[in-house]
Amino acid sequence: AHATRAVLEGVAFGLRDSLEILQAMGVSLHELRLTGGGAKSPLWRRILASVFGQPVQTLQAEEGPAYGVALLAGVGVGVWNSVPEACAATVQLADTTAPNPDDHAVYAQLYPRYRRLYPALQPFWA
C-alpha cells in the first residue's frame, strides 16, 4: 500500500510541476478537473487536491481524453464555435474533492525535496 501511494504521490508532484510551468507562462487556471479511470479513485482525487492545495472537480463523463478529443473534433467541424462553448454545452461536474489540510501541509514540505531529487535521479533513466 505504501509503495502504491508513493507512486501516486510522485505522479501528483510531476503534475504539480506541469501546473507551475503553465502558471509561469501566464496561463490562468481557475479550476482543476479530472476525468477518466483515475478520477474514480477517492484516494487519487484527495492526493491531487492536497498536492495542488486546491479543490479538484470530477466530471460525469468517464471517457477521459477521448471525450476531450471528441469535443475538439466537434469544434473543428463546426458543431460548436469554440472549446469553451463545447464545454459549456456538454461538460457536467460530478463531484468536488477539497484538499486535506494535514496532507497539504506534509506535501508542501515534501515538494521541494521532490524538486531537488528529480533532476538528481534523471541520469538513471535518461
Report residues per predicted region.
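Glycine/Thr-rich phosphate-binding loops that ligate phosphate moieties of nucleotide
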Residues: A1-A126
